[in-house]
């Protein structure tokens, strides 16, 4: 007798567990400029990420080139912090001691003094003509075509402003007219005069406050711009002017380690000594640029490339760690005499002071790779005596303006403030998200229009979902049976989430993420439309989950601020939720009342009431940031939208209707012209149509048909056949015309 299964052995223990087949989760890879490839990202200590970013040199307004780097790094920082959940410690510097700042501060000070001195008109004319001599020499010596073109534009403007003042002086014009011409010349010649005044008097400036006022002002403007762009503030902000003692100590240790040398009160880094060291490599980022004297001299600064300065170096490839100050330059005490820091050493000393001997990430613009970042790496590794000061070097791509190179020195740039006059900070950020952070971004009307349309597309989806979620139901009514459409949409949702995660792991590929999000919304829109056709209510919980996820991703990217659960904030991130929850119940009541009135008005054909209802929808409520959408047979949809957005939509609609009407009128006018031309042609008798063309034909038969050309040669059979067809067509047209005349149907 066999045992029953209850008595069988081994049945009281669990069976072996069958593990699912799982694909290994992708890890985050970042494009590392040190290897020029995507590398798996591993912080050096647990989940903490130490990050240093090169900040601005503050001597002028921040422009879209700055925005390219700082918005892009802000996105990367937020993704690492809020998506991958790293503990990011972010340090950024402000360069407030630099050749550009010194020169600009001197020029601004001297030009302001010159303007305030109110020079006589004849003196101004003479000074501008004198300043033109070295300026024209500078143009002739400039090889860069873009820079040459910029200088020539200045020369043209100055020359155009010179002539009226000269003419007015020759004619003894009145004081008011002379003053007007002088002001025009002063404005046109500001760059030219500033250079000339600096050459004459720059060395006489000894007041250090002149060199601190300029960067202090522009740093303040920079922070305002970053706040307007919703860029996170750094955890630590370092200013060069506050770190001079640390920089001096940093330079001294490099000298002590044998990689620096003193020359005429300045200190230089020996690139040869460093490169020959067994444990070091010079120019890790761009080794092929070693010896590029143009790039090296740009890195040294305009005030540091004179013949006497360059002769102090042991090698042209060496660079300044400490610069002996000349007259007219700010200075600080050091073991080598009064001087100021070199550009590259500033970042090394400040970053080293905060982050130590090695950091996880260093970021900056693509154009900083050589010599700035390569020199940073060399001097820092010489100081710390290691070969890993930076583990991952990230460089944001260039920014072009409508396909053209952007350059502050070439005066071809758009300030951040100007850009924010045309588009919102969110739209700018969306434009950046729709492109790879490491590739060139073209800032153009097409680029921004794509971002605006993306924002509108997402916003309409969020507004539609919010409207669906507001439909009254009890809590159990929110949960309905899932049919095939819901299962398919949910599968699509999770597929898109996986694709988005994979894209973020792949060098934080926001471009792909944005496309996947757009595709997901398109699927949702198709689902909602299918439900509408079937006269079924869409699944709220599924749409809530998807829209909440999309909102959370846009929050990660910094495109949404505040506590908004679904969609973009309305009326500012702080009061968005309160505004919507407060006013929406009243708007719903108003909408329902309006719908009831419209139904009665339609039944009784009261057109005046229907017109008032349309006026409320089209003109009154948009002024308050409310959009009503009427759908035949369905409840009116109520949407809260920014007032400016609605008014812009209204204006665009008006322009579109005007354009449509203009095209309609143009088509009618063309049709009328064509009909008039046809009528005129119909009036011509076939016997006259060729006889008028004496430049082509010389002889005709009795019906007016041509037989010979202008030279008296008889027409060929082919020509005759072709002309006969035209003749017969005209016969038919003229016959129709005669019939119209007989019937009285022509004017």
Curated annotation (Swiss-Prot):
A Pfam family it matches: tRNA-synt_1e
Function text: Catalyzes the ATP-dependent ligation of cysteine to tRNA(Cys).
Transmembrane segment boundaries: none
Cofactor(s) annotated in UniProt: Zn(2+)
Positions with a binding annotation for L-cysteine: 55, 95, 372
GO cellular component, one term: cytoplasm
Motif position, 'KMSKS' region: 405-409
Source organism of this protein record: Xenopus laevis (African clawed frog)
Cofactor note (record): Binds 1 zinc ion per subunit.
Annotated Polar residues bias: 15-25
Positions annotated to bind ATP: 408
UniProt motif 'KIIK' region: location: 100-103
GO molecular function terms attached to this record: ATP binding; cysteine-tRNA ligase activity; metal ion binding; tRNA binding
InterPro entries, A to Z: Cys-tRNA-ligase (IPR015803), Cys-tRNA/MSH_ligase (IPR024909), Rossmann-like_a/b/a_fold (IPR014729), tRNA-synt_1_cat_dom (IPR032678), tRNAsynth_Ia_anticodon-bd (IPR009080)
Membership in a protein family: Belongs to the class-I aminoacyl-tRNA synthetase family.
Binding residues for Zn(2+): 54, 347, 372, 376
Record's keyword terms, sorted: Aminoacyl-tRNA synthetase, ATP-binding, Cytoplasm, Ligase, Metal-binding, Nucleotide-binding, Protein biosynthesis, Zinc
Subcellular location: Cytoplasm
Ranges of biased composition (kind: Basic and acidic residues): 651-683
Assembly and interaction partners: Homodimer.
Protein name: Cysteine--tRNA ligase, cytoplasmic
Region entry Disordered, spans: 1-26, 651-685, 700-721
Gene3D superfamilies registered for this protein in UniProt: HUPs
Predominant location category: cytoplasm
Segments forming a coiled coil: none
Enzyme class: ligase
Swiss-Prot/TrEMBL catalytic activity: tRNA(Cys) + L-cysteine + ATP = L-cysteinyl-tRNA(Cys) + AMP + diphosphate
